[in-house]
Regions:
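Helicase P-loop NTPase motor core
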Residues: 36-39, 44-134, 160
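Conserved helicase motor
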Residues: 116-119, 140-147
Length: 299
C-alpha cells in the first residue's frame, strides 16, 4: 500500500476460519492500529436468523476471545435443539428420520442442510439419507459451472439457442434438449428449475437464458441443486437454509484436535448462523465443550 490511504476492507473477524491459509482475525482487529484514521462501520444487525438462533451464536462467541454480538431483528422462533445419542449410527438414523418428517410436512428439501465438521462425516450422512430414499447432494469445492457435465449442458443450450424459435415455447424446447442427459440428472433438473424461475422474471427465450447462464458462471452464482444439501462447516460459509442440522457435534470432532480452539469456536459459530428458522444439533458420546458453554447440555 505504501502511503496510500484509499482502501476499504470488509470482513467479519467472527467468521475467520481459514488460518491454515494465513487468514486470522488479527488482520481486521488490528487494522485501525496500522491505519489509525480509518473509519470503522460496524454492521451488527442479524437479518438472517431468529433471535433464538442469534442468541446461541452470541453465547458461543462470548465464551471465547471475541466479544462480538449480533442484534436480532427478525421475529421470534423455536429454540435451537440439542440431541444426544449413544452411537453415531443411532444419530444418523435419527437425523434421517427428522429430515424425512420435515420434508413430509411440506418443506422444500432445498431449504434443508445437514452440516458436519469433516467430509468423512458427510459420506456417512449421505448413506443414511440414501437408505430411506431422501434425495441429497454433497456440496463440493468444485464450482457448478466448471463441472464437465454442466459444461456439456451449457454447450448444448448454446447450440440449441441458434435454432430455437424466438416466439416458440422455449421452456419445452429446453426440456427436450436436456433429456439427452437423463430426465433424472440433478444438474439438468437444476437448470430446468432455474429456467422456469427466470421465465417469471422476464427471460423469454433460450438465447436470453443462455446469456443469464453465462453471467451466472462469471459471477459464480449457480442454481440450487435438488435435494437436501450436505456440507462441511467450512463449505457452508456464506450460505443459508431455513432448516439446519449440525451433526457430529461431539468432543472428538468439535474442536478438531489439530486445529486452534478459537478458530473451531468461530467455525461452530459459522455453522449456527447458517440457520434461518430452525437449528438442530446432535452428537454421539461426549458432547463438544462448545455445547456445554452454550448451555445446550448440562455441565
Amino acid at each position: 500500500m505504501g502511503k496510500r490511504e484509499d482502501i476499504c476492507v470488509v470482513g467479519d473477524p467472527a467468521q475467520t476460519i481459514y488460518s491454515f491459509a494465513g487468514a486470522t482475525p488479527a488482520f481486521l482487529l488490528n487494522f485501525t492500529k496500522k491505519y489509525p484514521d480509518a473509519e470503522v462501520i460496524r454492521l451488527s444487525a442479524g437479518y438472517r436468523s431468529t433471535p433464538e438462533i442469534i442468541n446461541l451464536a452470541n453465547t458461543i462467541l462470548r465464551s471465547g476471545e471475541l466479544g462480538h454480538d449480533l442484534d436480532a431483528v427478525n421475529s421470534h422462533g423455536e429454540l435451537p435443539k440439542s440431541s444426544a445419542f449413544t452411537s453415531e449410527s443411532a444419530e444418523l438414523i435419527s437425523i434421517a428420520e427428522k429430515v424425512g418428517e420435515t420434508i413430509k410436512s411440506g418443506i422444500n428439501p432445498q431449504a434443508i442442510a445437514i452440516l458436519a465438521r469433516t467430509n468423512a462425516q458427510l459420506e456417512a450422512i449421505e448413506d443414511a439419507l440414501n437408505l430411506v430414499g431422501i434425495e441429497n447432494q454433497i456440496r463440493t469445492a468444485e464450482r457448478f459451472f466448471e463441472r464437465g457435465a454442466v459444461r456439456e449442458m451449457v454447450a448444448a443450450i448454446r447450440s440449441g439457442s441458434v435454432l430455437s424459435d424466438p416466439k416458440g415455447d422455449w421452456l419445452s424446447e429446453l426440456r427436450d434438449l436436456l433429456k439427452q442427459f437423463g430426465e433424472n440428472d440433478k444438474f439438468a433438473r437444476a437448470l430446468i428449475q432455474l429456467a422456469y424461475e427466470l421465465s417469471s422474471d422476464g427471460i423469454d427465450s433460450m438465447r436470453a437464458f443462455l446469456r443469464e447462464l453465462e453471467d451466472r458462471a462469471e459471477q459464480n452464482n449457480p442454481p440450487a441443486l435438488p435435494g437436501v444439501t450436505l456440507a462441511t462447516l467450512h463449505g457452508a460459509k456464506g450460505l443459508e437454509w431455513d432448516w439446519v442440522f449440525i451433526a457430529g457435534a461431539s468432543a472428538s470432532n468439535l474442536p478438531w484436535a489439530s486445529a486452534p480452539i478459537e478458530e473451531e469456536r468461530r467455525l461452530f459459530y459459522v455453522g449456527i448462523t447458517r440457520a434461518k428458522r430452525s437449528l438442530s444439533i446432535s452428537y454421539a458420546g461426549e458432547p463438544s465443550p462448545f455445547l456445554r458453554e452454550a448451555g445446550l447440555v448440562s455441565a
